[in-house]
Amino acid sequence: MKEATELNEDMLEEAEHLALLEPEDDGTFFQVTNLLNIMDSESAKTDTTGPGLDMRKTLASVIITEKATTDPCVVMNALIRCLQMPEISTQRKMNIYNIMQEIIQQEGEMEEHCIQRLVAIASKQMRDITEAEDFETAEVASETLVALSRNHFSLVMYELQHHLKPLNLTDEFVIVTLAKLANGNVFEFMPYMGITLATIFTMLRLANEAKMRQVICSAMETFCETVQFYLRHLEDSLYPVMTEDQFAVKLFPMYRYFVTVWLRHQDLEVKLGVIKSLRPMLSLLLPNDDLREQVYDYIPLLLAEFQGTGHWPLFPSLLQVLRQILEASVTTNTPIPPMLLHPIFTELHVQVCSKAPAQQQFSSQNLMEIVHCFIALARSYPKELMKFFFSQVEMSKEAVRVGTLALIRAVVSADDPKINIKTIYLAIRVVKNTLSDTRSKVRMAILRIIGQLVLSGFQEKIKGWGLKYVSVQLTLSTYKLTNRRECFYQRDLEEKMVHKVTMDTVKIITSSISGMTNEFWVRLLCYIMETDYTEALTPICISLTNLAENQIHGKDTEAGIAGKSKHVDLPAPQKLLARLLVLMSSPYKGEGRGIAMLNLLRTLSQSIAPSMADMWEQEIPLLVQYLEEHTEFTWNQKTWEDMLIQFLRNSLKKTRGTSWSLRLSKELNNQIETFDSPSLEKGFLYRALGFTLGMGLEADRVEVLLLELLYKTDYSNDFDREGVILCFGLCARGQVKTVLNVLQDFEERIQESEQSWQIGAWRKDHPWRRETVKSALMVMYSCVSSYCHPQMLLTHVDSPITSKIIHHYSSSCQDISLKMAFMKSVVQVTNAIKSIQDPEDFQFAHKSALTGLIVVIIKAEPPDHLVSPVRSMAMDALSQLSTMKPFYSPEESTELMDISIHTVISLQPPGEDNESVKTLYANTMSSLKQLMEGLLQRQLDPKGLQDTVHLLEKWILSEKEWEREKAMALHLHLMQIYVQSIGVCIPLKLGQFGVLVGLIAPCTCDAHRRTRLASINVLSSLLDLHVSQTCSLWGTSKEQELQKCKEDLQDTDMNKISSASSRVAKVVCPEFNCDEVVSLIQKLCENIGAMDLQHDRAAVTWIGIFLQMRVKELEDKVAEILGAILVHLPVVDHPEVRRHLIEGILLLAHYHQETVLTSLLRQPLPMESHLTEVWLAVAENVPFARTMLHGLLGRLQSRFTAKINATSKADIWRLAAVDPLMTLCTIQLLMEKMDQDDKFPDLFPDLLYTFLLQLGSSHGPEAASPVLKTWRLVHTGPLPQEMTLQRCSRSRITIKSMQLLVKRINREPLEQALEEQSVWSLLENGGTFLEGVSLMARLCMQNMENYMQRLAELVLTGMGSEILSCCISSTAICVEFMSDPVLHQEKLLRPVVLMLEKGAGQDKDETLQVLSLRALGNMALGAPRKVKQYRKLLLEKCLGSLQGQVSSSAMAEGMEALTKVLAELREGDIGSSFEAISKQCRAFFDNESELLRLKAFVLFGKLTKVVGISKKHFFKGEVKRGWVSLLLHCQDPCPSVAQACVATMFQCVHFWGWKSLESSFGHSNDSINEQMTVFQTNMCSVLAQKKPAVLCGFLLETTVFMKNNLSRIRIAACNLAGIIMKQLSAHYLKKMDLVGLRNSLQDLQLDSDAGVRRAALETLKVLDSCNQHWLLASPRGLP
């Protein structure tokens, strides 16, 4: 009940403090609110845009703070009021609290009531945590309370203590704030410390959440640190004093609870918090004697934490706690219970020795904590600890032993007086127990302990076992390192570490121990002589030098040396000198062993060779000085080796006359197998050996050593092989004959031949390969030539040296190594020959053979990649051979150039990351340049230059940029050499300059910068050469402009590059003559398409510039230029490039039209796309296109005109023969593509007429005359197929062109009429062509009156042409013109008639004759009034066509023409021609030709109308003579003939005077045959009465027609005969040959036609009837 009352009071008090304040100053409140709003808005902006906008927020905060300086209470109340506003954001709360903290720090006076309200509000918001954001509010509220505590501690502490109640788990921020108060107000907090700790202790059982436990642990850590601070500053405290023991007593229960309960919590964060709080607790607990032992009791619980899974983050803090306890036990001399020692030993030892996972491994700091723990244990419990260590090393685990030895080393190294000698003794016992362990880490640990013992002052403890162990390890590690295997890399690394530790130990020992045993001296000296592992030689040499100096000066009595002598015990002097010389060849290995060895050599000089001692005293310091002045990065190997060789030479001079040098040679020879290959030491060894052998005086013993060296060399090892070769070369300097004898002897001994090669018998470890030995022998011979005396060289160079080289190469498999050896040998031999100052005109006999072999080698190399230096070496060899006599011929030089260029330039460039290939690549290119230069020097003339450039051309034009770059670089190099060498001596050939420039001009726009620069430099060189040879006015301004262009070509912008290239073209153009321009353009055209688009653009740009600048001067060269362009235009793919070339053609055509036109028209058909593009470009320019169209028309018309003689070059081209089909195609294309608004008013007649002529010519002049009314031309024989196809194609193109022409003039009636009447089909067909011409002419006359005059003029001209087809076509047109008044109106009738007269009078062509006759006849239609004027001519030509050997077509046309003409004449106009016409006409009545019969009957009918009185009697006789024919042909099988015959017959009836018969035909409905029967019956009746004799004559004529070819005529004849016999009297019948008539009729009974047989039978019946009638009428007895 009491607690409830207190709770209610607290709530009422809190509610009172939290009640909303009444506003004291609304202005301040609103101002503060506005400023807080600004801060909130700026905070939102800052979250999204960054801290750049935080200025306004800070300014608002500063304004509120500044206002609080004058009136803090008002501002604070306003802030408190804002803090109490509902739904306030967390950010605003934080801003308010931060401002409050700043106001509180100002130390202004505030009312206590205000402070109380602030404390209450902050305390409440600090404790009200419901969401994650509330933690931030609680934190700033806590900070505000801490800030208030500085001036109002009691109020704040009262509030916090008010909420800290026993057995009641408070809020976490209450404890956090209490910890902060304790840390910030130590002395003020101390009175509350006891009660605070006691209250918190009561909460421990209630704190089940991990977070709360962490807070309490952190608070306890702070509280303990505060107590320690308080205890250290007790004198400054004003509060009641609380002793350390009192604090310890209060803390221990919490310590116990933490260790026993909370430390076992599963949360690692809780564990870590507990352990961190233990250290400050132990600082207060361990000084207390009573509590210390109780702390010891809880050590097992701490040790247990080392065994937890995943507890590795706790280990650092745990180790610190354990170390704190152990060190306290040492300082207080309070031993830990013995039962706890072994667990502590074990747990700590395990942490050192176990192989924990990577994330659990200790840092060096943690390891030091453990070491300090063991040191503390060693101080108090040395015997127990060493006993534990001994038990651990008894185990075989490497990690355990290494860890244990490391801990022993730490104990030994501890500088602590409490660790006595007994402890060291015990430790050494433990170490000795591990000496037999061979594992690397154990050995290193033991060596480190030995070194540490020396460093710690226990040298005497290692003199026995320690030195021996070090010596053994030095030997053992060296052996293992020199015999290591590649598959045991890890083991080798460990062994290296062992060796390093061993060397460090040796260094420590030799620098720390005053005395040394003789055994150790011997071991170290033998180590230098025998070891193959040379990395440790430097410290060993230094140690030996120090020891030797001690021995020499008698300072080391233990060594057993007298001390007065300067000699020490050494192996063989030559052996030691050889060893040290070889090792000194790499002076900076092993930390600078060279200086150490030189000092050792100087120290031992008296012992090695007393005769050399004085010289060594002078020269060794110089060698040392050189090494000291340089480093491993600055020294020069060759210089150093030369210094050593000179040192050796000077040393050997001191022993001249003795066998010292020979013994040294043997030792050097023995040393060869002790070094690896390759190595600097072994290389120097071969050099020293060769030099030493060369100085030997006993040739036989030198031969033995050389032969031994040859046998034991591993020739498969490149380094050894080269070393032996160098050795033999150096030896040959003084022993050339000996060396050659040895080589020959070696070859004989190994039985060197093509059938037997048994070398492997001497080398079982490294079986020799035949090729490797052969390559070595080749280079040995060449090396001998390089080093031997010049006079001896000329004696031996051909034989045996060169001959042996060729033999060994030719008899081998010729792999890469052999090839390289062979070419190396060739170079060495040639260099050796060239080095002779006076070769006495030496002729190298084997030059040709060597060249052939090298060429084969080059050709065998892969073409696209570089795999070896074979190419480079081969070209170097050829370069050297080219200088030898006899020199190469020009053909041989060209062939060598071509082979070399091809094998190098085709190579792909190396990658950027492959330096070795890049070097190989550069060397190969350099060798090629050198070879090309050498060969070019032998042919320095234009031909040689052109041949060389020709070889480079295909590479300069390559699509691969690396090939272009290399080729251009080589071109530049050779061009510079040529210009420098030849100058103005020999001018270039005509056109050569243009070819050379045309080749490289496009490369000025190459995408690769180096190629562009090389090309412009080549161009500059060519210009320099050209200007110097032609004395051209090449000025400074041009040179400057060219230089600017070069600079611009280095740009990366392709537009600038193209512009620069164009400027270059303009600069150089004036330097070209016309021939050079042609050659340039030809070369540029030839190379278009060979590279990329940029090059093609550059090429056409250059062409355009040259044509623009020089076109007027190129009249004689147009055909060549145009030909070059047209030849290459088809292969140009890119439209832009094609357009530029076409523009060049148009430019040429503008100035030289005839030449260009002829060249274009002479291109073959079908028209290619490139030609189409040219003409399309022409069509775009209408004026120019019309000009070209005129020219094309002229070309077509010239075929039909008389030939004229050319008076100019333009005439020659204009009159040149061209393909008319090509011309037609071109005209059609232009008409189709030209501007549609151009109607061709001036060209229409010419075009139309020309097209018609072309059609006529395409159908051929071989056609026969047309058949009347069909216009079909009948060819006399089949045309060849090719000609037929061409003519058909020409016809179609011509017709299409005519259609385009008609469509363009926009005359729809004409166009429609042509389509409706199928004129185009008629024109296309050769058989109907003339009919189509007539229709075309007729329609044009009807629709195109304006053009008739011009067309008539053209027709007149064409009729006079010598070309038959032209005459025929023109005459066909004239046929229509003659039927129209146009000719008469244009006063062209007379010349036309004269032309027609000529055509009608000729007999060579039937068609022309027919058309001429037709045209003459049409005069009656077009100019009827002129017929009388030309009647004589007309009658003559028409009548002439009816006489003589004339075709039926001409006869028919003649009769038709007469029919037309007679219509306009009278009898008097005809004159005597009437009789001839009548007779000729009647003669065709019975003609086989229907056409002729038709025309004859029509003409005869026309004559009946013309005949007058004077000719009537004559014509009556003609009618009588032709009457039977008329009667019979009225039944002609041809209807038109029968009709014409009937009409003519009735026109002739009136000449008989039979008016009654004129109207007897055609007035009944009977058939024609029936009407004719009636007519004939009536006629015969009349004649029988009036003129029976005439009727008898008709019967006789009728009998003749019974044999006519026409069946209808035979029928008609039978019928007419029957009619006549019926009408004749018996008197007249008796006079007739009736027997003959009967026979004829009987013969007709066998006729194939049934109608004839019936008609004959009927007539026979009539005949029999007549006979019977005659018999009855006659008297009896009379016949």
UniProtKB/Swiss-Prot annotation:
UniProt keyword Repeat, yes or no: yes
Keywords for this protein: Repeat
Pfam families (UniProt xref): HEAT_Maestro, HEAT_Maestro_2, HEAT_MROH2B_1st, HEAT_MROH2B_C
Database matches in Gene3D superfamilies: Leucine-rich Repeat Variant
InterPro entries: ARM-like, ARM-type_fold, HEAT_Maestro, HEAT_MROH2B-like, Maestro-like_HEAT, Maestro_heat-like_prot, MROH2B-like_N_HEAT
Superkingdom of origin organism: Eukaryota
Placement of HEAT repeats on the sequence: 68-91, 92-128, 190-229, 293-313, 314-350, 380-417, 422-459, 571-610, 614-654, 737-774, 848-887, 991-1028, 1219-1261, 1387-1425, 1632-1669
Keyword Repeat recorded: yes
SS bonds (residue pairs): none
Protein name: Maestro heat-like repeat-containing protein family member 2A
Organism field: Mus musculus
